[in-house]
Amino acid sequence: MKKVKKAVIPAAGLGTRFLPATKALAKEMLPIVDRPTIHFVIEEALRSGIEDILVVTGKSKRSIEDYFDSTFELEYSLRKQGKMELLKSVNESTDIKVHFVRQSSPRGLGDAVLQAKSFVGDDPFVVMLGDDLMDITDSTAVPLTRQLMDDYNATQASTIAVMPVRYEDVSSYGVISPRLESSNGLYSVDAFVEKPKPEEAPSNLAIIGRYLLTPEIFSILETQKPGAGNEIQLTDAIDTLNKTQSVFAREFVGKRYDVGDKFNFMKTSIDYALQHPQIKESLKNYVIALGKQLEKLDDCSSSGHL
């Protein structure tokens, strides 16, 4: 039985929701307090037992490669000044074994995953999307990627992470048509549907950015026709795979943080900051004071006195 040791992280998107910042900085490098978002994804991979990581990048993504490269001058300066805690935090990213490949143009998630074919070979692997951060404020939780790996060890089948969303939001996701719950939280699936209309959605169980796939997915992606948004959709390829071999869905019951838009990015930053040992107390006091200030403004507004 082949073990799951490889992870693929697509990071070639243009990040248009965060312009103009992403004109010069990769979206995956936007910081949650003091760590870029991609750091949390890779941290989840390592905690799950992943040994080899491939990041699929595109143009203007050099900052990701720089983050995982050593910086001799900085490390020397920190060591000379005796700033060993900062040095340790810098080395967190340079001690990780990360490979890179470039997607020539953004043609969809399916095409990004296809760029990993030679890296993956004949092994099962996980795909981890950077817009979804899982349980980043709970270091005791079993990582979602680890849960998918455990499912694979039991079934030897591809398994996709899903989570309930509001029906009015299903058109932003791929969703599943569940057949039955074969064990606690693990579903057999009739179909995978990319971004359905709410009235046509087979369920509200949405795919949330963690996939464990068998290598047979690549032969499907090589001939996959463009789908929603005129892009090569990974969900469509998974639905095709499900017709020849079982693909399961694992319902995630932890805390998912969506960092794909400004509002949810800020919510994630606040939640994480309120757990950060260096700033949590000061931030908590500030948030409480700000809440009281906003209540006063609301009271004045409702009474007509500003």
Curated annotation (Swiss-Prot):
GO molecular function term, any single one: UTP:glucose-1-phosphate uridylyltransferase activity
Q: Does the keyword Methyltransferase apply?
A: no
Q: Which GO terms describe its biological process?
A: capsule polysaccharide biosynthetic process; UDP-alpha-D-glucose metabolic process
For the keyword Nucleotidyltransferase, the answer is yes
Q: Which InterPro entries would you find in this protein's record?
A: GalU_uridylyltTrfase_bac/arc (IPR005771), NTP_transferase_dom (IPR005835), Nucleotide-diphossugar_trans (IPR029044)
State which Enzyme Commission number(s) the record gives.
Answer: 2.7.7.9
Q: Which UniProt keywords apply?
A: Capsule biogenesis/degradation, Exopolysaccharide synthesis, Nucleotidyltransferase, Transferase
Family matches, as Pfam families: NTP_transferase
Q: Which reaction is this enzyme known to catalyze?
A: alpha-D-glucose 1-phosphate + UTP + H(+) = UDP-alpha-D-glucose + diphosphate
Pathway assignment reads: Carbohydrate metabolism; nucleotide-sugar metabolism; Capsule biogenesis; capsule polysaccharide biosynthesis
Highest rank taxon of the organism: Bacteria
Q: Cross-referenced CDD domains, in alphabetical order?
A: UGPase_prokaryotic (cd02541)
The text of the family note is: Belongs to the UDPGP type 2 family.
Q: What name appears for this protein in its UniProt entry?
A: UTP--glucose-1-phosphate uridylyltransferase
Organism listed in the record = Streptococcus pneumoniae
* Gene that encodes the chain: cap3C
